[in-house]
């Protein structure tokens, strides 16, 4: 795992793929599909120390516009070791969230359904990107929405653009076919005061 391969993961799954324009209006197209090209899904990287990014474990937001990671918070090695206990040391996590108003202004009540549809597209794109890199991904399915909001720092963010935490994916950059045994002791309390 290095900064270049991590960049490739995001580039192949969630990045801007092209720009279109028509009669003076310009808009981006992305690698992952989205209903109405509205892209309500946001992504966050949780990683240990990574050369080129940070010397400490971090939570970063992925910006498709800049194809860059925006560090939101650092946390201790102790918390990181607890998070990856029983997993390979180069494991990373990607958290996904939805911003419902990006769909609701156009689709009304159907926005909830379309946001989850787009979440599925993002999950599939990440999984395909991992497979192309020879990596494995698995859903961390035992965290509550509230726990995930705390871990991603979404419980303390601007209330004008509410993000709802959707899921967390563990990514292991190796071809080991053994079953991933995720540490069920990821405790959101460790992340409460990061932001």
What are these regions (language model features)?
Residues 1-195:
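Acidic, surface-exposed loops and disordered segments
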């Amino acid at each position: 795992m290095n900064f270049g391969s991590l960049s490739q993961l995001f580039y192949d799954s969630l990045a801007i793929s092209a720009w279109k324009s028509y009669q003076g209006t310009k808009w981006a197209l992305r690698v992952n599909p989205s209903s109405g090209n509205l892209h309500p899904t946001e992504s966050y990287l949780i990683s240990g120390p990574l050369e080129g990014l940070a010397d400490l474990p971090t939570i970063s937001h992925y910006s498709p516009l800049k194809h860059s990671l925006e560090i939101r918070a650092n946390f201790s090695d102790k918390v990181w070791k607890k998070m990856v206990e029983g997993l390979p040391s180069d494991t990373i996590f990607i958290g996904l969230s939805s911003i419902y108003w990006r769909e609701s202004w156009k689709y009304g009540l159907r926005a909830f359904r379309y946001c989850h549809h787009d979440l599925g597209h993002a999950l599939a794109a990440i999984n395909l990107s991992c497979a192309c890199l020879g990596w494995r991904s698995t859903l961390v399915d035992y965290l509550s929405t509230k726990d995930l909001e705390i871990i991603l720092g979404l419980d303390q963010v601007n209330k004008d653009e509410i993000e709802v935490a959707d899921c967390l994916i563990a990514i292991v950059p190796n071809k080991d076919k053994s079953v991933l045994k995720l540490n069920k002791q990821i405790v959101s309390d460790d992340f409460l005061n990061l932001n």
